[in-house]
Amino acid sequence: MSKIAKTAIISPKAEIGKGVEIGEFCVIGDGVKLDEGVKLHNNVTLQGHTFIGKNTEIFPFAVLGTQPQDLKYKGEYSELMVGEDNLIREFCMINPGTEGGIKKTLIGDKNLLMAYVHVAHDCVIGSHCILANGVTLAGHIEIGDYVNIGGLTAIHQFVRIAKGCMIAGKSALGKDVPPYCTVEGNRAFIRGLNRHRMRQLLESKDIDFIHALYKRLFRPIPSLRESAKLELEEHANNPFVKEICSFILESSRGVAYKSSEYSSEEKQEE
């Protein structure tokens, strides 16, 4: 049975699932759909064509689904899709997509978005990610699974962050980050590998292989792109080579790599 506060303002066109809790002074618009077990604390605003998945919990003063902050937006149909078991903390803002992107913003399952996180239009966030307080994502950003982003970090539009990466706090990131890397700084560059996450997700032999692969890729000569092409030719059937090298070759913004900033020393990768 759903539990809905008397002061909540809910459109009759909204769809409310079983066991949903809606706190005091929440505002729920026409196109909103709440799956079963969703919990909204007080003063949450949900607008637009917004879907919230099972057991997601949204805290006070979060605003989801209002018009994208994009001057090109002209009122076209767009969506915000949030998966299951997410925690969205106070004052988060998440905008739907636009005609200039994929027409939707997508958030996977089991993510934690801490207070004051901003997710702009057409972003895609995977599952099991943590975005710490004050993280700001511009439009069209893609974030893979198991990514951690430190507080007060800003990320440029169209940047891609692959699976298992760690972005240090107070960073300004303007280029793509391939799988399992750590980046830090303003501007942020790759500093090493995220071995903590790798140990959680991979076997030891695979970690060693990826470490050796990055050492070869990040040699001064040949270029990073040429090295990626060579690795794909030599190890075409290896899934890690495919994942990492294809990501590098598909990058339109370039990779956040500078030889003077990267260290392969074990002590800097922990």
Curated annotation (Swiss-Prot):
This is Acyl-[acyl-carrier-protein]--UDP-N-acetylglucosamine O-acyltransferase. Its main location: cytoplasm. GO terms for biological process: lipid A biosynthetic process. Pathway: Glycolipid biosynthesis; lipid IV(A) biosynthesis; lipid IV(A) from (3R)-3-hydroxytetradecanoyl-[acyl-carrier-protein] and UDP-N-acetyl-alpha-D-glucosamine: step 1/6. GO terms for cellular component: cytoplasm; membrane. It comes from Helicobacter pylori (strain J99 / ATCC 700824) (Campylobacter pylori J99). One of its GO terms (molecular function) is acyl-[acyl-carrier-protein]-UDP-N-acetylglucosamine O-acyltransferase activity. The gene is lpxA. Its EC number is 2.3.1.129.
